[in-house]
Amino acid sequence: MERLLIVNADDFGLSKGQNYGIIEACRNGIVTSTTALVNGQAIDHAVQLSRDEPSLAIGMNFVLTMGKPLTAMPGLTRDGVLGKWIWQLAEEDALPLEEITQELASQYLRFIELFGRKPTHLDSHHHVHMFPQIFPIVARFAAEEGIALRIDRQPLSNAGDLPANLRSSHGFSSAFYGEEISEALFLQVLDDSSHRGERSLEVMCHPAFVDNTIRQSAYCFPRLTELEVLTSASLKYAIAERGYRLGSYLDV
């Protein structure tokens, strides 16, 4: 049985090094899809590069944890900036859901302005769309706009509440991450998905060249290792040998 594999590189627009890494992993590797940060410092650079790589499917990485929002978000920002304190607000059940709804719509419109088309799918920076308070907002929005949504089903307790017309892959994995990146790890992710009987799988990745912005990230040099693995000819062969077809969320 042929299975669909979506290799999605997060953080398009984070920095020029990140952008170049994603394009390299698409052009000479197995990355088929990316998600863009519309408030990223290098988003205009990402847009420019994407024009020369039409095969790269581009979704939107909804941002609530970094940089400046596009709308006024007094309930979520500090000194006008987003940050990881969103986890504390979620634990306290104090998230400004109306502000988040408006920001989602604004980032979506900004994406269309930048790229000239709808995103192929939605996900979020640091997976905040999987918060139980935020997930229904994003799921409903994706269904209404007719675009797919990354769903990590492990923490999802309200799967029965999904909109009937919401599209997603059957499986999602964030396991290709950390200090032990290798071809063997990537293939283990595929084998685990096959054993679960999933007909389609998204694997998240972060290939990049290291620049000053990436150096400031807690996840820095493994991004280079990811890039090396994702552009390996032997990995591409092993994926095909396992019965996977590379594609994007347009195929689900």
Curated annotation (Swiss-Prot):
Please give a single GO biological process term from the UniProt record: polysaccharide catabolic process
Q: Give the matching Gene3D superfamilies.
A: Glycoside hydrolase/deacetylase
Q: Which domain of life is it from?
A: Bacteria
Q: Does the keyword Ribonucleoprotein apply?
A: no
Q: Which GO terms describe its cellular component?
A: cytoplasm
Molecular function (Gene Ontology), one example: deacetylase activity
Q: Per the record, what are the reactions this protein catalyses?
A: N,N'-diacetylchitobiose + H2O = N-acetyl-beta-D-glucosaminyl-(1->4)-D-glucosamine + acetate; diacetylchitobiose-6'-phosphate + H2O = N'-monoacetylchitobiose-6'-phosphate + acetate
Localisation per UniProt entry: Cytoplasm
**Cofactor entry:** Mg(2+)
Q: What class of enzyme is it?
A: hydrolase
Record keywords = Carbohydrate metabolism, Chitin degradation, Cytoplasm, Hydrolase, Magnesium, Metal-binding, Polysaccharide degradation
Pathway, per UniProt? Glycan degradation; chitin degradation
In terms of InterPro entries, this protein maps to: COD_ChbG_bac, Glyco_hydro/deAcase_b/a-brl, YdjC-like
This enzyme's EC code(s): 3.5.1.105
Q: Which residues bind Mg(2+)?
A: H125
Known partners and oligomeric status: Homodimer.
Member of which family?
A: Belongs to the YdjC deacetylase family. ChbG subfamily.
Biological role: Involved in the degradation of chitin. ChbG is essential for growth on the acetylated chitooligosaccharides chitobiose and chitotriose but is dispensable for growth on cellobiose and chitosan dimer, the deacetylated form of chitobiose. Deacetylation of chitobiose-6-P and chitotriose-6-P is necessary for both the activation of the chb promoter by the regulatory protein ChbR and the hydrolysis of phosphorylated beta-glucosides by the phospho-beta-glucosidase ChbF.
- The protein, known as: Chitooligosaccharide deacetylase
